[in-house]
Structure formats: structure tokens, C-alpha cells
Amino acid sequence: MSLDHKHDGDATAAPTGLPVSGAVCKTGAPMSLWSTSHPAAAAAELERCAEARHDPGWAQAARADPETRYLISRATMHLIRREPPTQIAFLGSEHPLIAALDPSRQVLLGWFEGRRCVLADLPADTEPSVPGASFEELRSLVPLLPEGQAQLLVYARALLVWRSRQRHCGVCGAPTAPRNAGHLLACTNASCGAEFFPRIDPAIIVLVSDGPRALLGRQRSWAPGRYSALAGFVEAGESLEDAVVREVDEETGTKVSWVRYFASQPWPFPASLMLGFHAHAHETPVQLDGELEDARWFELEQLRSADEALLPPPYTIARRLIESWIQERTGEQP
């Protein structure tokens, strides 16, 4: 089961004890696009404050706080200022757009850069007048935004997609309504009461090596000449390691062992969590099954000297897998 993981070849100190209408937000570890022992560039801290989601007065507390920042989204697009530097066009709680927005269309994201941050999910026909700002898609923004803001939009987009796809109960078909500050959708049918949480689709992405070479593939939809690490969704009842072995075999006919976890990256297009691995190939002939347009072995020097047209973009876990393999073979920093 191939995954077009769409990597185009292909995701400050926190406040201490910030209150949410009586709730207390505890500090946590810095968050970024990466979850790994080898982090990417340092990101601004996001504290999700899960305990604050249970406060029924959270939306009113956010409105009453002049420091609250609202991340404005419509469908899956986000309000952005392009004037250098490119950044999220946050609005304050005093903005008329916020005052008119139903609380059911708001989601508490947590605290970002020491300030409360709320996702405002605008109706499709809303056209806010914010000078110098426009709605843009996340995919084009990831390489342009500061690391922390890119991570925040990844988080917001995942919630937006889930909310748009879970408007009705999957058990009885009744409408759903948000709870837990927007992080839970509950069936409104009292005799049903099913609850739904944000969906995450785990997918493996793996850099296969036989020692001196690395195996990369390409999909037909990618830019000409671009190759990337192999990827696919994890199936029901399957371990991550088994998914790596199966996907590589299905897509290329290559047998692998020695599967080693590397890092993870959220990729909300629409709801993937990319789990990166290295694997060693002990049978190397490539036999395509039709899921990929091509797959081939690349020598170390080919990848060391490759231009950007060949490699996946720098912000993707696919690129980091390739760079980590080069570093392991040569000792060079990417």
C-alpha cells in the first residue's frame, strides 16, 4: 500500500503556571516539526496545555485576555503576512472578527511563545479585512515560516481537516458538537453519545541501504527527476518494523533487515504521522510492482553532489534520512 507522502518528492521559554479561567498550564519540553534525538533548528515553544481543555470557560477567558493571539484559518488555509519576514497574521481578542465568531468554531491550541493561542475556524464565506494579509496553503509556507510557526500551522491544519471530516457521528449519523476546547467531537444524539478524537494515520518512511548505496524511488506525480525515500501506510495489526519490511518488499522487491528508528514528522495532508527508519538490504535487485514509477540504487557520491532537483526538500523527513545516511558514511555534517 503505497503512500504518496507529498514531500514534493516528497512536518522561547514556555510560561509557568499560566491560568485558563482557573486551570493551570504546566510547562513542557520544546516542540518542533521533529520528534527525534537529533532535532532540527530550535523552534519556539508550544505548550499544548491539555489540562486546560476541560475548563468550560476557556473561550471566555481567552476573549478577556488582551494577550491572546488568534490563528485565523478558513477551510485549510491560513491568514499570512508576506511582508518580510513571512509570518502568521495573528489577530487579537479585540478584533471584531473574533467577537462575532461562534465559540464552537474556536479551538484552544495552547500557549505559543508565552501567550495563549486559539485557532479561529472561519466560515467559508467570511472575508476578513486584514491589511497586508491573505489566506495561503500550508504546503507552500513550511519552508518560509519560522520553525515554531510552521509547527503551529501543522498542528492547526491537522485539527481543521479532522473537524471538517467528522461533522457527523460515524455510528448513528447525527451531527457532532465540539467539547474539550475543540479537541473532541461528540455525537449530539443522547442515545448514542459516541466521541471522536483527532485522527492520525501512521506511515513509515525508510532509507534503505546496502552499505555503499541507498535505494530511492519516485512517483509519477512528482517533479521530473526527483527521488525520495520509500514510504507507505501502516496496516491494521502491523508493527512499524513489519510495515517497513513489507512496504520495501512490495514496492521494490528488496528484502531488508536491521530496521532502525530515526525520527518522526507530522504531515497533515491529510492526517499522516511520518515515522522514519533506516533499514539494511540483504537482497538488492529492484522489481517494481507498479506503485512507483521508478526505484534505483544511488551511490554515495551521487547523493553527496546531487542538486535540489533530485532530492526532497530540506524540511522533509525524507531529506533528513538521506542526509543522516551521508553523514554516517562520511562523517560530514549536512
Q: Which positions does each model-derived feature cover?
A:
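Active-site-adjacent beta-strand/loop module that shapes the phosphate/pyrophosphate-binding cleft
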Residues: 265-287
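The catalytic Nudix box helix
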Residues: 228-262, 277, 281
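N-terminal strand-loop-strand
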Residues: 185-228, 255-256, 279-281
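Cationic, low-complexity basic patches in intrinsically disordered or flexible, solvent-exposed regions
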Residues: 7
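Conserved hydrophobic/aromatic beta-strand scaffold that supports enzyme active sites
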Residues: 108, 119, 168, 186, ...
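Cys/His-rich short segments
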Residues: 155-205
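Nudix hydrolase/Nudix homology domain
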Residues: 17, 22-166, 177, 223-227, ...
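Leucine-biased recognition of intrinsically disordered, low-complexity hydrophobic segments
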Residues: 3, 15-18
